[in-house]
Each structure stands twice: as C-alpha cells, then as structure tokens.
C-alpha cells in the first residue's frame, strides 16, 4: 500500500493525549515515542478542559476504570470535539461488566468518536451482537465480523477497527482487511492498547482522511509486529522490546513493500 502518513508523524511529532489504563500507560507512551509522536498521559479531571486544546488527538481507553476516570473521559472527549481533534475509543472489556457497558454507552452518547478500535468481542458488544467474550479478551462468536465493523461505523458515524488474526477496517461504506501481524501480539498485554494510540497518531496528521489513516496505522503496526517476531517463538519479553525497536525503524518503503490488504 502507499504510505502517506508515517513521514508526516515524524515531521510533525503530534502530541497524543492518552487517558488509558494502568497496564498500558508505559507501553503506549514508549510506543508513541518510538513511532515519532509525543505522548501525554493525563487522566486528571481538573485538566480535561485544557489538555485536549494543546493536543492533536485523544485516546480514551477504559481498561482500568478507577476514581473519576469516567468523568475525565467525558470531559476530555467533549473538549476534544469542541476543538476538532480526532478522538479514539478503545472499549476494553466492554461486555465484561455492567459498569463498563454503561460507561461506553454514556461515552458514545455524549462524545463524537473518530475511531472505535477493539477486538471482536468488544466491537460485537457495541454492535449488539451475541458474542462469548472472556473478560477483556476477544472470546468466541459466530457473527460476520465485517458486518459488525460496518454496523458500528454506520451507527456512530466513525471508522471502526476490529483487531485480530485478520484486522478489519470500515467506515460504513468501504471496508478492508489486513493480513499482516503475528500470533505473539495476544501474548503481550496492552498490544491492542498501543495499536489504538498508534492509530491516534496517524489520525492526528490525516487532515480528515480517517479511513486511509486508520488503514495505514494498522498495516504499519502489524508489519512492525511481524518484523519483531522474526526468529522468535515463545520469547514474549524479547518481542515486546523488539516491537518498540521496529516501530522506530518503520519506513514508508517497508509499508509499501510488506502491506497485505484486501479492499
């Protein structure tokens, strides 16, 4: 595929505001730095009318909802909408508890999201489809995942990304599948959360071309995973470090040569 946005990230160094979970914060911040973006990891509700105004994109990740997180997410999302920056929702484990479901319901009702990214179980839950999720893991189900992505995108007027062995990107009118990646991704906690942050960096420099930016973000990230996993089998610790190295080493030429997409 043609790489449009990676070079822009390195040139512009966009500031990405992350309200993320305690498991993912360090990995997401380092991943953004490796890619060429700048992370800002603030969840203090008292700052949420200011921080989005100096940022180029916002990530809302519900992985470990504690204290005033929901209030902070709602305020940050509304401020981001006011200033017109892209907003990414990562609805971690949305189907696991009633509190998570209600949090996501309220977020979707009060904040306009640019991208909703999650695993199959999370996006199926948002679409109202039957799915046997396992906590925050994807679980199993029989639904047509392309149809799920399209349904979520159409319902919320956004781009939807279902990540898994095959990644699916849809904006409700166009849908693509990505066939890069590695089985080691699910072995490293927060690898999906980092993907959401990476998507935000690409969206930040996309000038409104959200489908193509999400597509390139996912291709770039999964190629980095492929390259990091070379010669590794069960060495998940080495994979995590190598993934950061490969994000830093990514080039537009690598994306063009290695991207495997069906549109």
Swiss-Prot record:
User: SUPFAM superfamilies this protein is in?
Assistant: Ribokinase-like (SSF53613)
Q: What is a single molecular function from GO for this protein?
A: magnesium ion binding
Question: Its pathway?
Answer: Cofactor biosynthesis; thiamine diphosphate biosynthesis; 4-methyl-5-(2-phosphoethyl)-thiazole from 5-(2-hydroxyethyl)-4-methylthiazole: step 1/1
Q: Which residues bind ATP?
A: 117, 163
Cited Gene3D superfamilies:
3.40.1190.20
Which stretches are transmembrane? Answer: none
Which terms does the UniProt entry file under GO BP?
Answer: thiamine biosynthetic process; thiamine diphosphate biosynthetic process
Catalyses which reaction(s)? 5-(2-hydroxyethyl)-4-methylthiazole + ATP = 4-methyl-5-(2-phosphooxyethyl)-thiazole + ADP + H(+)
Co-factor requirement: Mg(2+)
Write down the InterPro entries for this protein, in alphabetical order.
Answer: Hyethyz_kinase, Ribokinase-like
Q: Which family does it belong to?
A: Belongs to the Thz kinase family.
The protein depicted here goes by the name: Hydroxyethylthiazole kinase
This chain's source organism reads Haemophilus influenzae (strain PittEE)
The gene from which this protein is expressed is thiM
């Amino acid at each position: 595929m043609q790489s449009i946005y990676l070079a822009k990230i390195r040139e512009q160094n966009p500031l990405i505001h992350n309200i993320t979970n305690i498991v993912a914060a360090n990995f997401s911040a380092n991943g953004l730095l490796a890619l060429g973006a700048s992370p800002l990891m603030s969840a203090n509700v008292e700052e949420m009318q200011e921080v989005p105004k100096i940022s180029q994109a916002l990530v809302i990740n519900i992985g470990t909802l504690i204290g005033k997180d929901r209030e902070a997410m709602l305020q940050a999302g509304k401020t981001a909408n006011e200033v017109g920056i892209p907003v990414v929702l990562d609805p971690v484990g949305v189907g696991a508890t009633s509190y998570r479901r209600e949090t996501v319901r309220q977020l979707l009702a009060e904040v306009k999201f640019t991208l909703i990214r999650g695993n199959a179980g999370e996006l199926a839950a948002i679409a109202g489809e039957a799915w046997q999720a396992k906590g925050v893991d994807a679980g199993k189900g029989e639904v047509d995942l392309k149809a799920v992505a399209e349904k979520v995108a159409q319902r919320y007027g956004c781009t939807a990304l279902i990540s898994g062995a095959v990644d699916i990107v849809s904006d409700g009118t166009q849908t693509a599948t990505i066939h890069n990646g590695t089985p080691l991704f699910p072995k490293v906690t927060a690898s999906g959360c980092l993907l959401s942050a990476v998507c935000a960096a690409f969206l930040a420099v996309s000038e409104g071309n959200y489908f193509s930016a999400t597509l390139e973000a996912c291709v770039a990230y999964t190629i980095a995973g492929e390259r990091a996993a070379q010669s590794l089998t069960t060495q998940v610790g080495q994979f995590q470090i190598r993934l950061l190295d490969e994000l830093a080493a990514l080039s537009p030429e690598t994306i063009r040569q290695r991207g495997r997409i069906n549109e």
